[in-house]
Amino acid sequence: MKNIDYLLALTRIDEVNFVSCYIAHFLGAKKIICRLRNTEYSHRNATITAEQFGIDHVVYPERAAQQEIENLIREPSTIDLQEFKNGKVKMLGIQLDPSSPLIGRNVANIEQSNPYIPHKLAVINRGDITFIPHKDTKYKVNDIAYFVLPTTALNEIQSMAGKSPFKVKNIMIMGAGKLGRSLAKSLQEDYNVRIIEHNHTKAKKIGKKLSNTLVLDADGLDVDFLTSENIEEADCFIAATENEQTNILASLLVKHYGVKQVILHITTTNYFRAVRRIGIDAVVSKNISAVNEVLKLIRSDQQDLPVTRFEDIDIDAIELTVSTDCKYLRKRYTLEQLSEEYCIGFITRNN
């Protein structure tokens, strides 16, 4: 065990992870990363803390997914959103509707027509294919275009793609599990939040804890209930129950009734591409969010390459610091000499 650089305790049971970490720490593992569901262990006055078990880093899947969902709510016209350089740069995915002014035009033409919008089209996801576009690549209907841009240009890039930016005010969450409760607690001060929970006991219990959230004791798949709650007036619907089939069905149902933004949470990645094709606006997985957190922690410790993975496209985003002794650069390159298998999304120089 002393030769182990990292011990990753990633089971779904907190107690098993704690014991594994303690044994690994006792046997001399250099670094220990632990996955925990219960966020109470992070509280200052917690009886049990990660430090007591020799844990260096803790990853909370629900918390990671919560952050991703909140980012999507702030930019509701996007289906994927990742931040770089402490939020100064963003990579966002936008699905192109038939009415998008980009359809039928190539990348070079769009760049020439919009010289004052700083952006880079980094990736296109088209059906089951993900590829790096070229200057003559034409945009097609239902393409998911991934743009890299400064945060200050978010509204401009969405307008360029034919999306009308709108602000979310009314949010409905289905499922009062860990993720649903955390979202409601975080969002209730800034939005009008309603949360649906079919378990009467649980609904009554969380109703006492969420003072600014309307807790609805009902079945989120009941059409009569949804119409009585004027579901069509909801700006955002988040399907966050523990059953991903229920989440998928609920998402399709409310999308049919005209909810502007539907965010679906699923555990596995099997359904990602399928649900995107049938009209779900954004898909989030707490497991993928947790994987990203683990990768960032390891890369950060090694001062190596921070890697961001995306849920359903075969692309990684890498942040590379170029120095005189950089082991990844053996010779000088110009942009024209780069392989077609990757592109440079942005360069930070002198801040």
Description of each model-found segment:
Residues 1-351:
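Cytosolic regulatory regions of ion transport systems
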